[in-house]
Amino acid sequence: MTAILERRESERLWGRFCNWITSTENRLYIGWFGVLMIPTLLTATSVFIIAFIAAPPVDIDGIREPVSGSLLYGNNIISGAIIPTSAAIGLHFYPIWEAASVDEWLYNGGPYELIVLHFLLGVACYMGREWELSFRLGMRPWIAVAYSAPVAAATAVFLIYPIGQGSFSDGMPLGISGTFNFMIVFQAEHNILMHPFHMLGVAGVFGGSLFSAMHGSLVTSSLIRETTENESANAGYRFGQEEETYNIVAAHGYFGRLIFQYASFNNSRSLHFFLAAWPVVGIWFTALGISTMAFNLNGFNFNQSVVDSQGRVINTWADIINRANLGMEVMHERNAHNFPLDLAAIEAPSTNG
């Protein structure tokens, strides 16, 4: 009898917990994805803050020349970063218990792997939580689909690219200058500026910014005034009202006369779908481009592609970019190797005369 009562009590507790977790009445929705999201993001955030402030230098290249990244070791907000896990570790799973000591774990850049893996799991769960809340509210799932673009980009940079290159040391450092360094090295090694998927991503990001600014300014400029000229237009609206707050016909007419008739949308749904889809598809392509370049399927190479009738090279912009790439690659990991591979592979000229 006692066992039955205890089981019923535990079932009631579990049922109450389930109802609380999945309740849409909470100030912040938790959901089952949130059960995993909260601890993973808290772990990633707390370790990032501690490591950014106090982590010792990391032997990123695996050549016993540690690189400092934390504030207490001489960096500032701009130059500071979480240094990626050492090349000596490669792609091995490297939790604290795999190292001989905490000092060794820190020296080999263990915090980077810990932060990145928890962060990726956390943002994936955040995306799942968006879908879960939409489902429980009877909404369509497109919010989570849109969020999949930055999740895909982060996964490509922090996970797919290191896998393709064979080491977490090739991942993006977690800092401002570290991000720029990653971008420069990526251009030097993969010629990303000449990759069509990156071009689509640039069009998506900048085009999305342009369209968002155009839409916001058009809506703000075509509000339906419910007040007198002496009152603020904002005073004529209440949150959640059923009536339209702006005149889409007026906005459509204005934009059609500004450019041409068919350059503007007269359907609100198709307009907002376009505003969402343009940057999302662009960022999807960027993530796909990073993932292909991770396995060295690089941008187009048009080096020395134009020659005159005598066979002499006529330099193009592609050749200028190639020279810049070589210079950036020489500067990269200057202690790990003397020359980039494409320079070192060239046969040296004879010195015998």
Swiss-Prot record:
Propeptide residues, chain positions: 345-353
Transmembrane feature ranges: 29-46, 118-133, 142-156, 197-218, 274-288
UniProt EC number: 1.10.3.9
GO cellular component: chloroplast thylakoid membrane; photosystem II
Gene3D superfamilies xrefs: Photosystem II protein D1-like (1.20.85.10)
Site (Cleavage) location in chain: 344-345
Positions that bind [CaMn4O5] cluster: 170, 189, 332-333, 342, 344
Reactions listed under catalytic activity: 2 a plastoquinone + 4 hnu + 2 H2O = 2 a plastoquinol + O2
Residues reported to bind chlorophyll a PD1: 198
GO biological process, one term: response to herbicide
Record-marked site positions (Tyrosine radical intermediate): 161
Modifications made to the protein after synthesis: Tyr-161 forms a radical intermediate that is referred to as redox-active TyrZ, YZ or Y-Z. C-terminally processed by CTPA; processing is essential to allow assembly of the oxygen-evolving complex and thus photosynthetic growth.
Keyword Cell inner membrane assigned: no
Swiss-Prot/TrEMBL site (Stabilizes free radical intermediate) positions: 190
Residues that bear Phosphothreonine: 2
Residues binding pheophytin a: 126
Matching Pfam families: Photo_RC (PF00124)
Keyword ATP-binding: no
Name under which the protein is recorded: Photosystem II protein D1
Organism of origin: Citrus sinensis (Sweet orange)
Gene name linked to the record: psbA
